Amino acid sequence: MIVETTIHSFSLWHHFAHKPGFDSISFAKLARSMDFQGISLSLNDANYRHLGGREIERMESLRAFLETHEMSLEIDTSGTTPAHMSEMLNVAHRLGAKTLRTYTRHDGTAEEMLEKTVGDLLVVTREACDLDVIIVLENHEDFTGSELLEIVERVDHPNLKILYDYGNSQMVLEDPLESLKAVLPQVYSVHFKDHVMIRADDAGQLTVAGVPIGEGFLPLTELTRCLLEQGLRRFTFENVWAYSAPIQDGRKALHGVNLGHGTFAYLDPPFDPARLVLKHSAHSPETLVELEMCALNRGHYA
């Protein structure tokens, strides 16, 4: 069995923010040195975030490096409005990326967000097909597995698939295994990561927090086995140390969720910053960069 492993730029977001000279080429070189076969790159802001700018020369330079070293590319954005998606599909095409990850940024109830997202994606899938780019819609702290599946089935286009994130269903209080079961036939790519739960008394509100892979409570082995049995052969490693997100308002615990136990077990304080950071301002940029690399290596070699 041959499995392609790639790494997400969010794994080193403090490097991009604080380490002088660290850019998309530096990231690709590091990924290659760690034996990853490709990268996922966040372009999730007006200046294309971890690409570092919108210049065509910058895009061509990264594409040339990746093609020279036979590395794959997936790019990330957010939002589903047709004008934005058209722009990003064309950026993906120029960069040589075969997939474009996005998630909804609509407001409202889950039903309202779902309807607006379906309407957007019905417009843009034709262009995705013309450019030979697969749109992967992520379970990004907003939809349950069944809600995400409904979107994809209603759009019903071969260029729209699902990106399954190992832990993001927790933000809507859905068990990761239940979420995966709902979307499994439509999963095209994944974000492999690890999480713990933090009590409201310790974080100000009930919170999901990222830790080095292997040091959290997600059922990594069981989730990975399900995906491999389904036939998935491409996994994106995402170190989410120092990331945290609250439980979404209005969500109630779904089937299989027992707060404080199992996958939703709480991590007790005091928190070792090598494992968990909730307040970035408590550490210098240099310390964040150092701790981030240590967390990446601990997860990579776990």
Q: Where are the language model's segments positioned?
A:
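Catalytic domains of carbohydrate-active enzymes, especially glycoside hydrolases
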Residues: 23-45, 95-99
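Charged helix-capping and loop-helix junction motifs
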Residues: 20-25, 54-61, 114-122, 173-182, ...
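Active-site-proximal loop/turn and secondary-structure-junction residues that shape catalytic pockets
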Residues: 11-13, 43-47, 79-81, 104-108, ...
